[in-house]
């Protein structure tokens, strides 16, 4: 059933949990934290996926497999019927050095084992220069860097946990909502320095944005800060804190997919301009479409009575208007 690489991956996950004193119940490729829902706590299932065993079926290419909503349906059932959350870990994700470290950070947070906790009051908000923002995302965000119109970050006011004063430890980035037809803004990336937690950090960054920006400059366009959308990666996050931040749940996308090249291990998302070529590669047995759980969509309709704009003086610089 499993390849030697799968066995290695599973052993590494188990060893990491053991080394960090994380309690779990296990069965085959599933490591369940908070098994039995102690004190009503939602279980957290680390579910390993040998991706080549779960391709999306394409009968015309003689590919047996599953439906595109295979993982979404299991995630939905776990969330709504079993008081659990499934964190899907594809083999190619664990074998990616950068993503593996982000996943480890997720596991520690879920288990309450993060050792470096900061508080929002110990940080100041600044606009993050583009290069610094993309570098931070590349190291600390699961899906890496993504261009944005505005990058806001939390910087430490003093040294703590061996992290120097003035270090960027959390980021929120904003841009135009790519998928929406409305005049809305999207939270593009949210990331925290790996193996750290910033209590109250998301709230501080979001409030700063809402109170300091009436519009967002996107290219040559000024987009009013009225509607904000957030797409939560349902493969790895349940979006449990969104309501406390003022977002309302809208819908599930259902399943999505990534294209996986078997020979090189390369993984890419949907490429509309190369669709014909990708299908040719699939017909030749070189690529498989691997399903995922899709996203959960949340929206905020900005209430200006709750988030009144801060009046700025002409001499104020964006990085100095702190909240």
Where in the sequence are the language-model features?
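Short secondary-structure junctions
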Residues: 18-29, 144, 248-252, 283-290
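Acidic-basic catalytic patches of nuclease active cores, encompassing PD-(D/E)XK
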Residues: 1-27
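C-terminal "cap" of GNAT-fold acetyltransferases
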Residues: 260-283, 287-305
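Short catalytic/ligand-binding loop motif for oxyanion handling, primarily in non-cytosolic enzymes
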Residues: 54-57, 95-98, 145-146, 236-241, ...
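A conserved beta-strand-loop-helix scaffold within acyl/acetyltransferase catalytic domains
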Residues: 102-245, 249, 254, 297-302
